[in-house]
């Protein structure tokens, strides 16, 4: 097995030549076997790596995070020349090692070996968090099934200096204080001793590592998604979507910002210790309309035309004081993977139902509510058309094609003159407000 790994390293190093200007190595297995011959300097690097393998090492690529290759390229020193970072495990003594090779006079030279312990290397990230022009290496070590430890290393004269670290379940790297450089947020699930915590790790220009933390909502069981984005007053923030038990719902979003020099959860309410205004049962937070601010979705039950319940989704944006305002409303059709941004004057006046009686057609009907007990006046249908007759079905009189995705065609038809019933709608509005869905908006998705 070791001999096979040594053979495969030759095309892998050729990949380094092909994409050395693009940052971290990303290459498919098929591409490994279709690369040109490599230069002598990469053959020398291969010899260095084979030497490590000959000592009983095995490749140990990170199991998570954005960079998951066993051999990676990254300009750590900021001189425009990529260093090579390679990840190994030594089963005999259980050591995990990260080797750094630098180009010197046309040859790769081993400049540093970072040694850690654990069952695996969970993740690696490279970013300049103190603004000195060089990138720190942030390595996550998988200590056990439930425990991970992060170590932050500065590269000084091509040697790694351990600055500090902390335990975590989920890591988020983003500019939280708005200084133009990334910060580290370590998120920890509840333990028997403490509740869930978000910890800010900030590296000062003088090399001092500063930490501050804030409570997350009581009742968290898993963290499903972490997003970095802006609040409506311009503050950068980290949005932590979690699943658990929060009274009236199973999903909550904690909104963490830097205030008065420390990390603060501005959405948390007392005495419950829960971000109550964000609790719901569906959907992750998102910049749903690509306007620049992250919104929190709160489902609202629509007046029913049948026993099947349907919801509109009200999307709320927050400011740095934790106050929210309604930004927009959508209707999401999860089964057919589309959503529609609803005009404000549809609020409280529109109901929906499904019509799936025609083969190859899945239809949602929007109706104006004449009175609380009905009747309903249909004014819009949106169809998802599939099967051999999809194109013909999309060309029926009155139907207007919105888009296509794979073998599916999405179309709509207006059933009443535009802007009837005092509602805002016409062909252009439906075209502009229709969107396809993506799975990461659903609860529990990454």
Q: Could you tell me what each predicted segment is?
A:
Residues 368-389:
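A short acidic-to-branched-hydrophobic micro-motif
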Residues 23-354, 358-367, 387-411, 415-418, ...:
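Beta-propeller-forming repeat regions
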Residues 3-29:
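Sec-dependent N-terminal signal peptides of Gram-positive bacterial secreted proteins and lipoproteins
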Residues 421-424:
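Eukaryotic low-complexity, acidic/Ser/Thr/Pro-rich regulatory regions of large signaling scaffolds
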């Amino acid at each position: 097995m070791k001999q096979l790994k040594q053979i495969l390293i030759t095309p892998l190093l050729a990949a380094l030549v092909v994409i050395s200007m693009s940052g971290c190595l990303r290459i498919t297995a098929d591409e490994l076997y279709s690369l040109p011959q490599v230069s002598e300097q990469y053959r020398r690097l291969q010899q260095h790596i084979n030497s490590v393998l000959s000592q009983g090492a095995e490749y140990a690529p990170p199991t998570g995070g954005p960079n998951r290759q066993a051999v990676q390229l990254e300009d750590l020193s900021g001189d425009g020349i990529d260093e090579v970072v390679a990840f190994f495990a030594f089963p005999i003594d259980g050591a995990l090692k990260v080797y750094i090779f630098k180009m010197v006079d046309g040859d790769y030279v081993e400049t540093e070996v970072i040694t850690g312990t654990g069952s695996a290397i969970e993740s690696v990230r490279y970013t300049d968090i103190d603004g000195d022009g060089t990138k720190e290496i942030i390595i996550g070590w998988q200590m056990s099934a439930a425990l991970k430890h992060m170590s932050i290393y500065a590269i000084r004269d091509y040697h790694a200096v351990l600055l500090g670290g902390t335990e975590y379940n989920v890591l988020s790297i983003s500019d939280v204080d708005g200084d133009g450089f990334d910060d580290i947020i370590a998120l920890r699930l509840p333990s028997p001793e403490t509740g869930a915590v978000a910890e800010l790790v900030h590296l000062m220009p003088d090399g001092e590592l500063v930490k501050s933390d804030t409570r997350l909502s009581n009742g968290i069981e898993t963290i499903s998604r972490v997003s970095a984005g802006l609040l409506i007053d311009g503050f950068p923030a980290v949005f932590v979507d979690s699943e658990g038990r929060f009274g009236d719902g199973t999903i909550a979003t904690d909104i963490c910002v830097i205030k008065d020099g420390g990390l603060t959860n501005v959405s948390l309410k007392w005495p419950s210790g829960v971000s109550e205004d964000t609790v719901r049962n569906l959907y992750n937070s998102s910049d749903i309309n690509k306007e620049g601010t992250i919104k929190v979705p709160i489902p609202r039950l629509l007046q029913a035309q049948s026993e099947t319940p349907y919801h509109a989704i009200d999307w709320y944006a927050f400011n740095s004081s934790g106050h929210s305002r309604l930004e927009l409303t959508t209707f999401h059709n999860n089964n057919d993977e589309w959503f529609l941004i609803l005009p404000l004057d549809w609020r409280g006046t529109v109901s929906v139902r499904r019509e799936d009686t025609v083969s190859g057609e899945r239809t949602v009907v929007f109706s104006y509510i004449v009175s609380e007990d009905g009747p309903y006046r249909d004014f819009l249908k949106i169809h998802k058309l599939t099967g051999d007759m999809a194109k013909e079905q999309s060309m029926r009189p009155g139907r207007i094609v919105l888009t296509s995705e794979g073998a599916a065609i999405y179309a709509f038809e207006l059933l009443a003159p535009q802007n009837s019933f005092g509602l805002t709608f016409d062909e252009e509005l439906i075209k502009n407000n229709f969107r396809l869905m993506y799975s990461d908006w659903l609860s529990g998705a990454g």
